[in-house]
């Protein structure tokens, strides 16, 4: 059964438990045939990026998980098909033995999710904790998320969420066919106070329409 990752930005509070769990699972641990140990520094197979919008005093902070997308049509597989493969469950794996010396795989990933291990001279990335999945367990990053912002499971199980989801890089979604789906990604942030000058009071529930003078894009929001 094909697996997918679901990340909901609205549920993420930036605790970075997933980021630490990945380090805990992979630093100094060898999980062959899927992965050699991850270095202490220089690599984050799962990381949380901050997205800051607005300006003081109206600021909105959101978080986005940056990770391997486990694409069905993975660019890295095209560059080194003998060293990168997709499992039946959809997880994309870089074979640590066959990929030795193939630094070109780092640049092949448009999501910047592949890292170079200078000591071992191999490219490395998220394996989806394939060794845990094989044992019927969840990837460590998913297991430690306290708010279920990051989930993992059968594609059919998340059909409703997938229908509403976005891609990390929308412009590459059709080409790469990523198996990591994003919900509630940060959008345009409009902030301010609307006042009725006649009543001299703040309006609540007023519908606002704004237009970008450069792009002519129109946005609507409610106070």
Residue ranges and their predicted role:
Residues 189, 205-207:
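Exposed beta-strand and adjacent loop surfaces of beta-rich binding modules
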Residues 193-203:
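Structural motif
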Residues 15-21, 25-26, 30:
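Hydrophobic alpha-helical membrane-insertion signals
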Residues 210-212:
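Conserved aromatic beta-strand anchor motif in extracellular beta-sandwich/beta-rich domains
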Residues 30-67, 72, 78, 93-193:
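Flanking helices and flexible, charged tails adjoining ferredoxin-like Fe-S electron-transfer domains
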Residues 86-93:
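Mid-length scaffold segments of soluble, non-membrane domains
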Residues 204, 214-223:
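Short, acidic Ser/Thr/Gly-rich low-complexity loop/linker segments typical of extracellular
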């Amino acid at each position: 059964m094909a697996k997918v990752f679901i990340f909901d930005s609205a549920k993420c509070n930036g605790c970075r438990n997933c980021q630490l769990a990945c380090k805990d699972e992979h630093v100094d641990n060898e999980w062959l045939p899927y992965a050699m140990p991850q270095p202490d520094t220089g690599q984050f197979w799962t990381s949380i990026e901050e997205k800051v919008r607005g300006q003081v005093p109206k600021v909105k902070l959101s978080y986005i998980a940056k990770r391997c997308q486990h694409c069905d049509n993975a660019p890295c597989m095209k560059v080194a098909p003998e060293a990168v493969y997709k499992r039946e469950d959809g997880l994309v794996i870089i074979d640590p033995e066959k990929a030795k010396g193939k630094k070109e795989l780092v640049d092949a990933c448009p999501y910047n999710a592949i890292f170079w291990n200078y000591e071992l001279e191999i490219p490395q990335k998220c394996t989806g904790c394939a060794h845990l999945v094989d044992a019927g367990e969840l990837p460590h990053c998913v297991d430690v998320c306290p708010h279920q912002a990051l989930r993992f499971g059968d594609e059919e199980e998340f059909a409703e969420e997938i229908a509403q989801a976005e891609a990390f890089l929308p412009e590459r979604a059709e080409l790469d066919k990523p198996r990591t789906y994003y919900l509630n990604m940060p959008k345009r942030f409009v902030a301010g106070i609307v006042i009725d000058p006649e009543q001299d009071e703040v309006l609540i529930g007023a519908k606002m329409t704004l237009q970008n003078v450069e792009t002519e894009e129109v946005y609507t929001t409610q106070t």
